[in-house]
Amino acid sequence: MSLIRPALVLFILLTLLTGGVYPLLTTSLGQWWFNSQANGSLIRLNGEVRGSALIGQNFTAAGYFQGRPSATAETTDNPMASGGSNLAASNPALDKAVSERVQALRAANPDADPRVPVELVTTSASGLDNNLTPAAALWQVPRVAQARQLSVEQVTQLVNQATQTPLLSFLGQPVVNILQLNMALDALKDK
């Protein structure tokens, strides 16, 4: 009987601490210090949510930059269905899918270098990658410029402006957020 009371008190105390105080504290700090990130890194235009800086979208029109292909192609609007294809590099299905993507990209981008950047034909581990390297974005510039009736220099300048350098300039590689780049293209059209 003498052990039950301290065990019960400790159980109640730890339940309140780990089930109440700790979650409230971490949620409050997250909302205070990292409000945008804690709420999904949403990108808004005129008060309307256009997407998240963290979730890739499927852009198919010629006047938009395209992101990485998704292994969740059937459910591109559902980020809960994220995941890679889990196909091995030696799998014929992966080889066929990559070959088809290369052919489609070459057909859609006839003025681009025939060497297609690898991230435009392979899926990411999450299937929802939102960024490309500047090289992959620049590869698409001739198609986007032609479709939008802009100069290659204008579109290249937008890509360069949208390029984000990694933290401390050495932790990672520069990337271009495709949603933000496409929104910048739309803003250029509206001017």
Curated annotation (Swiss-Prot):
Membrane topology of the entry: Single-pass membrane protein
Cellular compartment(s)? Cell inner membrane
User: GO CC terms for this protein?
Assistant: plasma membrane
Q: Where mainly found?
A: membrane
State a single Gene Ontology molecular function. P-type potassium transmembrane transporter activity
Identify the keywords attached in UniProt to this record, alphabetized: ATP-binding, Cell inner membrane, Cell membrane, Ion transport, Membrane, Nucleotide-binding, Potassium, Potassium transport, Transmembrane, Transmembrane helix, Transport
List residues traversing the bilayer: 6-26
- What's this protein's family per the entry? Belongs to the KdpC family.
Assembly and oligomerization: The system is composed of three essential subunits: KdpA, KdpB and KdpC.
Instruction: Describe its function.
Output: Part of the high-affinity ATP-driven potassium transport (or Kdp) system, which catalyzes the hydrolysis of ATP coupled with the electrogenic transport of potassium into the cytoplasm. This subunit acts as a catalytic chaperone that increases the ATP-binding affinity of the ATP-hydrolyzing subunit KdpB by the formation of a transient KdpB/KdpC/ATP ternary complex.
State what protein this is by name.
Answer: Potassium-transporting ATPase KdpC subunit
Q: Which organism is it from?
A: Klebsiella pneumoniae subsp. pneumoniae (strain ATCC 700721 / MGH 78578)
The gene that this protein is the product of is kdpC
